[in-house]
């Protein structure tokens, strides 16, 4: 039986999680309902027409409070308090918490109160039972993990690379910079924001700001806890980002050894999560790419045997959205 999911928050990530499930053609997950404060006609329109990912490759229609997608009816709700959602009556296995609001344990737990069996948060969380980067530590999932975080798009890009290279040559300490496309948390014109850098016009500036993505790797790879840090530079592109990761190794290594370890993982245990390439590509080449991380083999550098620099690309919307359904299915399997 497919895992029955409901999506709370039909914004940027909520819509793309929905779309990724349908575009993948996978039969092990089924969207039963969406909950969003916008009306169903607006949500259907934004699903059908996307400035970054193009038109939805299917049929979308609305009748009353039901959005029908490729012949499958999805109930559209508009409830402010997640505790009041009809998840018990709908027999929801997992609530996909995509609003960006309910990231603390007590808040996300309202979905459990409403009758969902588990909750998967599409963001870094506070007080969660486990943070998962699919492909790296989803094997740690246990039945008692009721509230799970899917980490961030950047952590999903960095963690597979760090995992492979720590196993191969050891990482003593490292620093990541993500050159990140602008997101909805920024402003289109100069106006108020609690982060004064993000208060500036997103499409006109390169904006240095913070990220917890590197430190969060320690949540999924305990051996690297406290060994990584990072920063973010938001740039005037609408989608696709890249990490620039520099680290000291536990022993001397070579460019060839680094690349061989990544290629082996990409063809083996991390196939579909981690990919590689060796030609001069640019950010738009990775738009709508479902991998969490696409490693640039020709960009690997090694200085004095133990200082390594690598880069890896990610579609910060689409890759992460595909991992949401992967993690949801993995959570259901251990129920």
Show which residues each predicted segment covers.
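A generic structural signal for alpha-helix starts
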Residues: 156, 252-253, 318-319
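C-terminal substrate-binding/catalytic lobe of Rossmann-fold NAD(P)-dependent oxidoreductases
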Residues: 23-86, 170-173, 178-307
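Short glycine-rich or small-residue beta-strand-to-loop segments that form or flank ligand, phosphate
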Residues: 4-6, 148-149, 243-249, 308-314
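Structured loop/turn residues at secondary-structure junctions
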Residues: 99-100, 153, 209, 250, ...
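N-terminal Rossmann-like NAD(P) cofactor-binding subdomain of oxidoreductases
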Residues: 1-199, 324-326, 334-335
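NAD(P)-dependent Rossmann-like dehydrogenase/reductase catalytic/cofactor-binding core
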Residues: 287-335
């Amino acid at each position: 039986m497919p895992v029955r999911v409901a999506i709370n928050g039909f914004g940027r990530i909520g819509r793309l999680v929905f779309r990724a499930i349908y575009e993948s053609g996978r039969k092990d997950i089924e969207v039963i309902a969406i909950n969003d404060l916008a009306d169903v006609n607006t949500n259907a329109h934004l699903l059908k027409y996307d400035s970054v990912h193009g038109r939805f490759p299917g049929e979308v229609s609305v009748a009353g409070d039901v959005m029908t997608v490729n012949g499958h009816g999805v109930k559209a709700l508009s409830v402010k308090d997640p505790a009041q959602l009809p998840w018990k009556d709908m027999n929801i296995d997992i609530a996909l918490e995509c609003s960006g609001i309910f990231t603390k344990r007590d808040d996300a737990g309202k979905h459990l109160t409403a009758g969902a069996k588990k909750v998967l948060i599409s963001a870094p969380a506070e007080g969660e039972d486990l943070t998962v980067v699919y492909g790296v530590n989803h094997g740690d999932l246990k039945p008692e993990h009721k509230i799970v975080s899917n980490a961030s798009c950047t952590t999903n890009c960095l963690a597979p690379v760090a995992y492979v290279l720590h196993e191969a040559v050891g990482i003593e300490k490292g620093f990541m910079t993500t050159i990140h496309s602008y997101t909805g948390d920024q402003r289109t014109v100069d106006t108020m924001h609690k982060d004064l850098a993000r208060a500036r016009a997103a499409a006109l500036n390169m904006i240095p700001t913070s990220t917890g993505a590197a430190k969060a790797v320690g949540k999924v790879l305990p051996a690297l806890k406290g060994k990584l840090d990072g920063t973010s530079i938001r740039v005037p592109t609408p989608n696709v980002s890249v990490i620039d990761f520099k680290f000291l190794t536990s022993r001397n290594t070579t460019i060839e050894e680094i690349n061989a370890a990544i290629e082996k993982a990409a063809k083996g245990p991390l196939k579909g999560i981690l990919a590689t390439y060796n030609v001069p590509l640019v950010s738009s080449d990775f738009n709508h790419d479902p991998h969490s991380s696409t490693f640039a083999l020709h960009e690997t550098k090694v200085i004095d045997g133990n200082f390594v620099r690598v880069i890896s690309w990610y579609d910060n919307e689409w890759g992460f959205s595909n991992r949401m359904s992967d993690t949801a299915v993995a959570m259901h399997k251990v129920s």
